[in-house]
């Protein structure tokens, strides 16, 4: 990567009064014009990173760079970034226009230019005609748009978003995901988004940093992280997973549940203990004698687009299955899956070791042919 817009080099943060370590040797580089997400549970350190970028907190050790310049000692108001907070931090006594225009007035910009810039920005966030509206009379989604408009009106190099969608209802939150992503792509400004919501991260991001206990556990594209989680924490934090103990017999051959199965992973020691991950949506229900494994249905819930079925095998392992077909509690069913559906996780593998192994042994060709080409390829394979 050339000329990262933001870089952290060996950054840590310790709150001295409580001797609490909240960030541990954080290193990353962010490319200009991308949508990045810091994803983690409460207390993982994600908001601390955001506040350090903004200048609201100082790093205990390490260096922070913005567009190639070290900014550790640069005050907040001198950094070319803008933060959208969870509560939006709007001025309740001001109108929509006055809120959005506020950063420009601080720069003592010409009134005509302010008028032009505010109108252009409100159009971008679909708030034309709301200039005179009082903040108290806006819906949650409209307040969100005002906060974003104020953040982008100065055309900062980076926009920081600290869980800005968490207060919205589900439908509005989903709509705002589309709007935020589309706006970021149209503006070409780097967005750094903080959330604990895995679905938000997967839906909007170019690149995700998964955080846990002050460390970046794994980073990658949404597809990479979902399909190839590095460890048990990531596999369970990002989506639902069936995780079993297993043994890697050799490259591309794994043993679990007392049986051996073809896999697509390699680069491990013969007979190395591993964990096996199969996603619920990758399990196909078949007749018992046609499945690779047999399980007994225990319970099920209807989730709208699928049934979530809980079943157990003869060894007592719990299996979650997503199926459009309804099961019968107590019946024995077969489970089928392909080698590509099996993901192998080594124990205590670092991200550097993981990335090197994945690059060498796993087919990560993520070229995008589109839906039509994909359908045509499937039909051609069926006709062979």
Curated annotation (Swiss-Prot):
Topology of the protein relative to the lipid bilayer: Peripheral membrane protein
GO molecular function, one term: ATP hydrolysis activity
EC category name: translocase
Binding residue positions for ATP: 40-47
Compartment(s): Cell membrane
GO cellular component terms, A-Z: ATP-binding cassette (ABC) transporter complex
Superkingdom in the source lineage: Bacteria
UniProt keyword annotation of Cytoplasm present: no
E.C. number: 7.6.2.11
Keywords, ordered alphabetically: ATP-binding, Cell membrane, Membrane, Nucleotide-binding, Translocase, Transport
Membrane-spanning residues: none
Ranges for domain ABC transporter: 6-238
Keyword Transport attributed: yes
Main location: membrane
InterPro entries recorded: AAA+_ATPase, ABC_SmlMolc_Importer, ABC_transporter-like_ATP-bd, ABC_transporter-like_CS, Mo/tungstate-bd_C_term_dom, P-loop_NTPase, PotA-like, Transp-assoc_OB_typ2
Pfam families, per the entry: ABC_tran, TOBE_2
Reactions catalysed, as given in the entry: ATP + H2O + polyamine-[polyamine-binding protein]Side 1 = ADP + phosphate + polyamineSide 2 + [polyamine-binding protein]Side 1
Xref: SUPFAM superfamilies: MOP-like (SSF50331), P-loop containing nucleoside triphosphate hydrolases (SSF52540)
Quaternary state and interactors: The complex is composed of two ATP-binding proteins (PotA), two transmembrane proteins (PotB and PotC) and a solute-binding protein (PotD).
Family: Belongs to the ABC transporter superfamily. Spermidine/putrescine importer (TC 3.A.1.11.1) family.
Function noted in UniProt: Part of the ABC transporter complex PotABCD involved in spermidine/putrescine import. Responsible for energy coupling to the transport system.
Protein name listed in UniProt: Spermidine/putrescine import ATP-binding protein PotA
Organism from which the protein derives: Streptococcus agalactiae serotype V (strain ATCC BAA-611 / 2603 V/R)
